[in-house]
Amino acid sequence: MLTLLPSLILLLSTLSLSTPANAGAAIAKAYYPGWGSDDFPLSKVTWSKYTHLTYAFAKTTKDGGLTLEGSNPGGLKPFVKAAHENGVKACFSIGGWTGSQYFSTAVSTPEKRTAFVKTIVDFAKKYDADCIDLNWEYPAKQGIGCNTIDKDDTPHFLSFLEELHAATELPISAAVGIVPFNDAAGNPITDVSGFAKVFEHIVIMNYDVWGPWGSTVGPNAPLNDTCAAPANQQGSAVSAVNAWIKAGMPAEKIVLGVPAYGHGFTVKKEDAFQKGSTTKLAKYPPFDNKNRPNGDKWDDKAGKDVCGNDNPAGGIFTFWGMVDNGYLKEDGTPKVPHRFDDCSKTPYVYNPDKQIMISYDDAKSMDHKGHFIKNFGLAGFSLWNAAGDYHDILVDAVRHGAGFKN
């Protein structure tokens, strides 16, 4: 059972207060998907909403190098230029779900670490970047399915980071899971103080907590799960922040990752609604895992992944995709049956004709997350991703909650 820090217990009892105690967050960050630049060019970015924007992704290669292949290689220079013109820090991110295949190899020996450090520093200089983000999914834990992996990835990663930190004055951040990195036995490490010394901040990826790999529909990005039944406590912003702080990461170095997308599930009508109702959605309904729905036009289509394995459709809907597909109105409010879960502080919608239920985030849930960030003294938020929002509804909401002026 999760043991909460006393300060976090106090916070949970005051989450509904409208006047938070902390002065406010400092980092308003988002990822910019290089591969989506045709649909979401730089001219569509509302730069004034952000302090940092991070170009995703530079992928790791077999020989210890980096490549922007698949992420519009010609897009990074104009991205940095536009960010600088708008007074925004321009970062680049290394790795990601499909780009972490060779992270383990690149940091596996002292010689390879030194070479990888030089590669990254040279890359940052070439593109005039202001900051470096590392998105290794995941040290000492398999990600997409064909990543190189070593039981000593975590200590190797720290040694590499210490060398990188010594080689550059640029701030270093990392996107991390909802529990600290794995040790050699596959358990989360209990001391991250060494990492705290080299990271300017970490971004906790508090999304994909529930998805089509489970047996029931659940919240994609729960704010809290300590109020849920034990079987439904899969992780949340509350438990993740607690775990990282308990291991030695200061709250002021933690940025909360928030999503501009949701997971879609095929759910029968008889399972989607509470018994005897045609309007009230059921909690944690079962879904058809053999019939994953197609998401919006940005969703991964069924086919082979980078590992060569057959994959079904992703079932992912961006926030704008939910508007385009008739789940939400232009103002981001629901157009179909809807439920807001008071424990996870996240919404669900269901289209009875398509038999698709989506767990996602809306303005209300983002405002709750923003207040959590502000109340607990976190560094700020990071949106995955800037292109997924619709008319800045989500970023405005989390900014409001976190104490930024919109």
Curated annotation (Swiss-Prot):
GO terms for cellular component: extracellular region. The keyword Ribonucleoprotein does not apply. It holds the Pfam family Glyco_hydro_18. Keywords: Chitin-binding, Secreted, Signal, Virulence. Its main location: secreted. Chitin binds at Y138, W384. Residues 26-405 form the GH18 domain. Residues 1-23 form the signal peptide. Induction: Expressed during the biotrophic interaction with cacao. One of its GO terms (biological process) is chitin catabolic process. SMART domains: Glyco_18 (SM00636). One of its GO terms (molecular function) is chitinase activity. It is found in: Secreted. The keyword Signal applies. Belongs to the glycosyl hydrolase 18 family. Catalytically impaired chitinase that binds efficiently to chitin, but not to chitosan, xylan, or cellulose. Despite the lack of chitinolytic activity, retains substrate binding specificity and acts as an effector to prevent chitin-triggered immunity by sequestering immunogenic chitin fragments. In plants, chitin acts as a microbe-associated molecular pattern (MAMP) that is recognized by lysin motif (LysM)-containing plant cell surface-localized pattern recognition receptors (PRRs) that activate a plethora of downstream immune responses. This is chitinase-like effector. It comes from Moniliophthora roreri (Frosty pod rot fungus). The gene is Chi.
